[in-house]
Amino acid sequence: MSQIVVCAMYKFVTLEDFEAMRQPLLDTMIKNNVKGTLLLANEGINGTVAGTRESIDNLLAYLKADPRLVDIDYKESYHQEMPFYRSKVKLKKEIVTLGIDEIDPNKICGKYVEPKDWNDLISDPETVLIDTRNEYEIEIGTFKNAINPHTENFREFPQYVDENLDPKKHKKVAMFCTGGIRCEKSTALLKAKGFDEVYHLKGGILKYLEEVPKEKSMWQGECFVFDSRVAVNHDLEKGNYDQCFACRMPITEDDKKRPEYVKGISCHHCYDKVTEKQKARFAEREKQSQLAAEKGFSHVGDEAKKLAQLNKQKKQQAKEAARKKAQQ
């Protein structure tokens, strides 16, 4: 397979007709064989998709034809295989869920910082540097001296701010995330709470890794991504992590050697949290996945749907043939 372009994109912009946008956008993705998920809400668009160079260019051209999305923010990386199984466009209340209705980055947010200027900002001893991502993402990589809020999801971030940050004490706050969307919304939250100097990394970690040379980089480790690559290294190539299919946590080759790890069923992160009923279900899923692989099919996604439909048609044809034979 030729090299696949993985494109992460977002823009905070008022889309009053976001519901009507869904089907034409999905049709465009399917027509161009672009897979992945895009989220639409009144506050904007967000998602990561993948396809050939031509396919991604066609999708971006379609989006930019809308004057509201002409400057949509996007980052690209590359992979040898398609990292997604389906084409989806979902309607949401928020394109990234903070859970506070009055926070609107379209009205107020912090100051963008270009990747080339990021090192100077976070090297300033007056700067409080906060990683706005989840615990499991931070575990495999973050910026030097960044604070880990220890959140399980983005909805927990406002509580962290209320309990740990003070606009009178923390005069200069810089935040970052994978592609820029969570840290942008985080700056809107802090501005609403009275913080003055609030900054966020434009384009997120992915843009930083793309533009800042390794020898000057202050990034440590790998960057978690929400697709089958699991993580990317500083060259934006697939990293050294795999993923537990039970809990979706990143795992290393050493983690796979631990007694709690059973492929497709459990790992040391979730072994004590997964019920026997769930383990049985995961075991069956893994079995079906292996059978599909042996036949040269994917167990999930559009290919799996086609296989299921084909099997259904064969069964119906067999039943019809048996019925006709019985009537003879």
UniProtKB/Swiss-Prot annotation:
Gene3D superfamilies per record: 3.30.70.100, Rhodanese-like domain
Q: Which SMART domains match?
A: RHOD (SM00450)
Keyword Transmembrane in the entry? The reply is no
Q: Which domain of life is it from?
A: Bacteria
Quick one: where's region Disordered?
304-328
InterPro entries per UniProt:
Rhodanese-like_dom (IPR001763), Rhodanese-like_dom_sf (IPR036873), TrhO (IPR020936), TRHO_N (IPR040503)
Q: What does this protein do?
A: Catalyzes oxygen-dependent 5-hydroxyuridine (ho5U) modification at position 34 in tRNAs.
Report the protein name in the record. Answer: tRNA uridine(34) hydroxylase
What organism does the record attribute this protein to?
A: Francisella tularensis subsp. holarctica (strain LVS)
The organism's taxonomy opens as: Bacteria, Pseudomonadati, Pseudomonadota, Gammaproteobacteria, Thiotrichales
